[in-house]
Amino acid sequence: MKNTNTKLKVAITSDHAGFDLKQKIRLNLENLGFGILDLGPNNSEPVDYPDYGKAIANKIIEGDVDRGIALCGTGIGISISANRFKGVRAALCHDVKTAEQARKHNDANILAIGARHINFEDAIECVNAFLKTDFEGERHIKRIEKLDKKSLAESSINTNDTELEEALANELSRQQNTVEL
């Protein structure tokens, strides 16, 4: 496993269930010298994981960060939310091996963790493996390209532009509620 990634810029986020573990992971990474962008939340009050999954996905897509770490109670909801965006490959990992494989074979750019199902020490081992492991490329590239192509072919418009999203939603509503002669 290479350790060429100590200069990575890493986004971190969670919902309320992952807040405490997020804080511990963030501090650990800051102490190791990683650039950290904390996308919230700022406390453990109830929040909706889709909002934070979208926020971290946008940071990956926009190139503001190299990798992301996203936590919720199980890791499932936040990974599903983030994976709705083209170019995002969020992997739910629970140990070093799955974190390494997610990077080596799938070029995962977001590590999802189930905060209710892992202790701090194991979570840190997963995070370290995820951040230190490089993508192998080669035969895995064509598989990722197939995923992106399939995603485009079978999905509706994928946009991060909220004005465009709103305009499209309004037009769809207009068409559904208007009889045109």
Locate predicted features:
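A short beta-strand-loop structural module common to alpha/beta enzyme folds
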Residues: 35-46
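N-terminal glycine-rich, Lys/His-bearing helix-loop that initiates the first secondary-structure elements
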Residues: 155-181
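Glycine-rich phosphate/diphosphate-binding loop of Rossmann-like nucleotide-binding domains
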Residues: 11-31
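Mid-chain, well-packed structural core segment of small domains
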Residues: 70-71, 76-116
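C-terminal binding/interaction regions
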Residues: 5, 11-18, 96-155
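Short, structured active-site "lid" loops
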Residues: 52-70, 74
